[in-house]
Regions:
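Intrinsically disordered, low-complexity, positively charged segments
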Residues: 15-23
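A conserved regulatory-domain signal marking ACT and ACT-like small-molecule sensing domains
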Residues: 2-14, 26, 30-32, 37-154, ...
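The feature encodes a structural signal of leucine-rich repeats
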Residues: 21, 160-161
Length: 272
C-alpha cells in the first residue's frame, strides 16, 4: 500500500523538523523515540528513511503456499539455510492457503533472490509479488540514523541534522511504502507552487485515468493515493507542483469531465 501526505519543514536548533501525520505514521507503525535508518544521494532533494536498514540487496517477497503441515516452517527454513537475514516477515491462513511476506537481506551472500524464488516454487508455493530494491539502488543506501520525536502537543516529527542534502525549509511531500516500511521525503524549496488536490470520482472505468490526464495538463504530480476509509470512498488525493496556467483553469477542466464528481484545490505555502 502507498500512502501519501504533506509536511511543513521547520528550522530548529541544530537542524530541521519534518512533521509526520497520523496517516503516514500509521502506515509505517512509527512512534516517538524510534530511530530510523536513512540516506540521500548527493545533489538530490529526496531523503529515504525506513525502520529497517535497507540496502540495494534487500528484496521483498509475497508468497502463497498450500496449507500443508510445515509449509510455513519450510519457507522460513529455506531463508535460514542459505544464511539470508530476514528483516521482517508475517503470515496468515486464508482458507487452505498460507499468505506470507518476507523482507530479506542478500548482502554479501552467495545466494540470490532468483535462487530463493526457484526453490520456493519447488516447495509447492508461488511468488505473486516481488519488489527488489536493486531497482532503486541509490534510494536504499540507508546508513545514517534519524529520530522520531514529539512536540509539546504530541505531534510526531522527524528530526534531521543541518547537513542533510536538499533541505532548504519550505514544504515536503511524504510517500510511505508500507510493504518495505520505507518513507520517501521530497523537499520543496520555499515559494514552490505546491498544490493539494482532492477529487471524488465517478465509479466508472477510466475515471482515474481521466483525473490524471486533466491534472497533468498543468501540474507535475509527485504523489497520488486513495483515501482508505468509509467516509471517503472514491476520494483521491494528489500532491503536485503547478507548472503552467492558473488554478481556475485547472478547476474548469475538471468540472467539464463527467468522470470527476468533485474537485478541490488547496495551495500549500503560497498564494495565487
Amino acid at each position: 500500500m502507498i500512502v501519501c501526505g504533506h509536511s511543513k519543514v521547520e528550522r530548529v536548533e541544530g537542524g530541521w523538523r519534518v512533521y509526520i501525520d497520523e496517516k503516514i505514521a500509521g502506515a509505517l507503525n512509527l512512534f516517538p523515540g524510534q530511530n530510523l535508518f536513512g540516506g540521500s544521494t548527493v545533489g538530490s532533494s529526496r531523503l529515504s528513511v525506513s525502520t529497517m536498514q535497507l540496502n540495494p540487496h534487500v528484496s521483498y517477497f509475497r508468497v502463497f503456499m498450500e496449507d500443508i503441515m510445515g509449509s510455513l516452517a519450510s519457507v522460513t527454513e529455506l531463508f535460514s539455510s542459505k544464511g539470508v537475514n530476514i528483516l521482517s516477515s508475517g503470515a496468515f491462513g486464508l482458507g487452505n492457503i498460507w499468505v506470507s511476506e518476507y523482507i530479506a537481506d542478500f548482502k554479501d551472500k552467495d545466494v540470490t533472490a532468483d535462487d530463493i524464488v526457484n526453490e520456493l516454487e519447488g516447495l509447492g508455493g508461488f511468488v505473486t509479488s516481488r519488489e527488489i530494491t536493486e531497482f532503486f539502488p541509490q534510494a536504499f543506501e540507508l546508513e545514517s540514523t534519524y529520530q522520531i520525536k514529539a512536540d509539546d502537543k504530541g505531534e510526531m516529527y522527524l528530526l534531521l541534522p543541518e547537513n542533510v542534502g536538499g533541505v532548504t525549509g519550505g514544504h515536503a511531500i511524504l510517500k510511505a511504502w508500507a510493504d518495505i516500511q520505507a518513507l520517501f521525503i521530497d523537499f520543496l524549496s520555499p515559494g514552490t507552487k505546491l498544490l493539494e488536490i482532492s477529487a471524488m470520482l465517478n465509479d466508472i472505468p477510466g475515471a482515474l485515468n481521466k483525473l490524471s490526464s486533466v491534472v497533468a495538463t498543468q501540474v507535475n504530480m509527485h504523489a497520488v493515493d486513495a483515501q482508505h476509509h468509509e467516509e471517503a470512498t472514491g476520494l483521491w488525493m494528489i500532491y503536485g507542483v503547478l507548472q503552467i496556467g492558473s488554478i481556475e483553469e485547472l478547476v474548469s477542466k475538471a468540472e467539464d469531465a463527467p468522470e470527476i464528481l468533485k474537485f478541490g484545490v488547496r495551495t500549500l505555502g503560497w498564494t495565487e
